[in-house]
Swiss-Prot record:
Enzyme class, spelled out: oxidoreductase
Name of this chain's protein: Putative 12-oxophytodienoate reductase 3
Active-site residues, record numbering mapped to chain: 189
Keywords: Fatty acid biosynthesis, Fatty acid metabolism, Flavoprotein, FMN, Lipid biosynthesis, Lipid metabolism, NADP, Oxidoreductase, Oxylipin biosynthesis
Alphabetical list of CDD domains matching this protein: OYE_like_FMN
Job description of the protein: Putative oxophytodienoate reductase that may be involved in the biosynthesis or metabolism of oxylipin signaling molecules.
Transmembrane segments: none
Spans annotated as Disordered: 120-147
Any one GO biological process: jasmonic acid biosynthetic process
Key word DNA-binding present: no
Biased composition (Polar residues): 120-138
Binding residue positions for FMN: 37-39, 70, 112, 236, 307, 328-329
Length: 382
């Protein structure tokens, strides 16, 4: 009986690559579908709330991998209302029951450590001070018309203190029970602001050459690895993305350099990269698969993200383009996404208007599971 079940599982994995098990360092995963880090703005006063335990545990499966929403490493690292942190004892204590709820479902949980840098406003900063950054250049408003405050360029002697904030936050995350941490080096936030030449503009050892611009990122990685161990550390990078008015003139060189730095830590767990922006071909959105050079270079687990659906996810895993695929909006709207992918079942549509609202239920924990939809349909038929 057990052998038959195992054979059936292997057959399913062969037919659906996303459902194949995977060994990620010390961790055994039962499938390749990862919850991407998603800002949800429901951690009041930057303290994780009890409703987050339900939200994350809904999306947890035995042997699945969840990555938390961006979690601030310090008071200066916050840029939006109701974003969680992990720099105070109160925050660490509040995370513990949330992590426990995920672990009870048998899932792994990584905490994404973030500092927004200049993507903030004075009213989100301690004592109304200016946001800190690699630069004093203000973000140019985009289509969202969000206006960020003019930042203050960090002095060279201040940078080690920010590096240490990441180190302490990593230690706090492990104390809260997380299985590991993901360093947020993507999407135009502080680490990205140092790395990309459009936003750096420094003339000290943290600016100018590619090596200098990546120095802050490398120092953060080294500090976090030294604190919690490389086998508990991943990083998210987006060399091609121009979010937050932050872009690089040579993203290929940037991504390649950073991967080489990651490889200096042989046990570093994973590299999570975001695809270039999508193109529209014959009315359909198409992923520009631009991560292959980095995947070939990196020695550890490679996670791809950026608009994937079931078909594309299966393809990139089957082709060896990625080991795991992170899903954001689809996982937000479908708490049982791995099961839906396994069954090729219809998906709930997400409601973008509730992504960043503060309601603890609506648009957060009220998306139906597949069984609930079936029951609803049966009720209608009767």
């Amino acid at each position: 009986m057990v052998q038959a079940q195992a054979a059936a599982k292997e057959a399913a994995a062969a037919a659906i690559p996303l459902m194949a098990p995977y060994k990620m360092g010390r961790f055994e995963l039962s499938h390749r579908v990862v919850l991407a880090p998603l800002t949800r703005c429901r951690s009041y006063d930057h303290v994780p709330q009890p409703h987050a335990a339900l939200y994350y545990s809904q999306r947890a499966t035995n042997g699945g991998l969840l990555i938390s929403e961006a979690t601030g490493v310090s008071a200066t690292g916050e840029g939006y209302p109701e974003i969680p942190g992990v720099w105070t004892r109160q925050q660490v204590k509040a995370w513990k029951p949330i992590v426990d709820a995920v672990h009870r479902k048998g899932a792994l949980f990584f905490c994404q450590l973030a500092h927004v840098g200049r993507a903030s406003t004075n009213d989100q900063q301690p004592n109304g001070q200016a946001p800190i950054s690699s630069t004093d250049k203000q973000i140019t408003p985009d289509d969202s018309h969000t206006v960020y405050s003019k930042p203050r360029r960090l002095r060279t002697d201040e940078i080690p203190h920010v590096v240490d904030d990441f180190r302490v936050a990593a230690r706090n995350a492990i104390e809260a029970g997380f299985d590991g941490v993901e360093i947020h080096g993507a999407h135009g936030y502080l680490i990205d602001q140092f790395m990309k030449d459009s936003a750096n503009g420094r003339t000290d050892q943290y600016g100018g050459s590619l090596e200098n611009r990546c120095r802050f990122a490398v120092e953060v990685i080294d500090a976090v690895v030294a604190e919690v161990g490389a086998d508990r550390v991943g990083i998210r990078l987006s060399p091609y993305i121009d979010f937050m008015d932050c872009f690089d003139s040579n993203p290929e060189a940037l991504g390649s350099y950073m991967v080489r730095q990651l490889n200096k830590h042989p046990e570093l767990l994973y590299c999570h990269m975001v695809e270039p922006r999508m193109a529209t071909v014959e009315g359909r959105r198409k992923i520009n698969h631009g991560l292959l050079p980095f995947r070939k270079q990196f020695n550890g687990t490679f996670i791809a993200s950026g608009g994937y659906d079931r078909e594309e996810g299966n393809k990139v895993v089957d082709d060896g383009y990625a080991d795991l695929v992170a899903y954001g909006r689809l996982f937000l709207a479908n708490p049982d996404l791995p099961r839906r992918f396994e069954l090729n079942a219809p998906l709930n549509k997400y409601d973008g208007s509730t992504f960043y609202t503060h309601d603890p239920v609506v648009g957060y924990t009220d998306y139906p599971f597949l069984e609930e939809k079936k029951e609803d349909s049966a009720t209608v038929i009767v």
